[in-house]
Amino acid sequence: MRLYDTRARGLQTITPSTPRHLTIYACGPTVYRDAHVGNMRTFLLTDLISRLAGMHGWTTTVVQNITDVGHMADDTGLGGVDEGQGGGEDRVLRQAATEGSGALAIARKYEEAFHSDLSALNIHPADHYPRASESIPEMIELIDALLERGNAYVGTDGSVFFDARSFPEYGAISGNRLEDLRPGHKFDVEADPVKRFHADWALWKKAPDTRTQLVWDTPWGVGYPGWHTECSAMSLKLLGSSIDIHTGGIDLRFPHHEDERAQSNSATGSDVVRHWVHAEHLLFDGRKMSKSAGNVVLVRDVIERGLDPLALRLAFLQHRYRQQMNLTWQVIEGAQKTLERWRSKVAEWANSPSAPMCADYREQFLAALDEDLDTPRALTVLRNLEKDATISEGSKFEFFAWADAFLGLDLARTVGQTPLAAEIPDDVQALLEERAAARAAKDFATSDRVRDELAAMGYVVTDTPDGQVLN
């Protein structure tokens, strides 16, 4: 398996630090609103890497954080739909005020919606979903270590800051150099007098007296964590000081992942993350999704249009994860047609005698995925197999079922299901109606005779509380 490593600026062979066991940390949602389809495409990346690892016979441990505190409205790098709005207010607190609810109630509401969206897209759940609000002791421990090592200091306002100049490798992920950064470049417009250097960032922020929610007492007073602190603390707690892959959206390269890397490496004295893998932006109708443009699309919007959410998953798979994608309703509708055709074919092929998969097609499929998750090429392998008249239907069924372990499209959904009434032959439909009338009249002899006639024609009738089911 080779993936594009943002820090290495090239494809890297992925070799787990523990043989045949891959560890992945994925930046998760800030739970103050519903995740849009662009966020979901990023979350899909981790699922694809994990599924491919499984196809190689590896096990995985996946950790995805839940940010329910500390992500300020002016923090950069989220790629959200309201970036930069609302000054320095905590996003969760701001939404809680808008909805007239408690902060944690808001966080749990949108966390639940996030898990529902993951399920709709058949994204396998992570092994751990640590919440920032429940990881405060680990953050305090991390900050203590950074202060002790000289990588952090207490500012003039009582907040604790990371000393960016104490980490010489800063900028290795994004290419930004500290000496080139100036106030206003994703930092305060003017240098902050409470910090030693304008590029330093808050590990722990002193809370104003007016803030009564999402605050904790620490050795540095009452306050709340910085956004970047959270990921370092949670990843180190659950995965230790050697993490194979860290995923996230391309927007997170700087400053979030640069800051996280500086914190984790400084605290442990080692290079914690081996590979940084990022998903590219998603546009909708050629534009970045935003409230002002009115083009923010959620998973539930797809469902409400009568489309299968797995058609959205297929639409994502039709593009490379690190290729900017322009999603439209036409693209999703086209994917829906492909999905319906494949499910119909798989159900048809399931009735054929089983046959081994074609080794050549299997090798082509894995080769495409192993080369930086080239999902468009992998889908082309399926299309070629579908049309290949030299391959038996039983073999096609086995291949599509095997490939779906990675694709996650539920291609066998209609196998064994009753055909639609319109597709049932007229003579079979007439017999079903005759049998239903016989059962209503308690003429069980006729009912049994008709059942036997249908069986001779290759149909099995099952009686349920809702009526007859034909297979």
Predicted regions and their residues:
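Short glycine/proline-rich turn/loop motifs
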Residues: 27, 94-95, 211-217, 363-364, ...
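Anion (oxyanion) recognition and catalysis
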Residues: 54, 147, 455
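Alpha-helical recognition segments enriched in aromatics with Gly/Pro capping
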Residues: 1-32, 47, 109, 115-116, ...
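Non-catalytic interaction-recognition regions
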Residues: 87, 100-105, 111, 115-141, ...
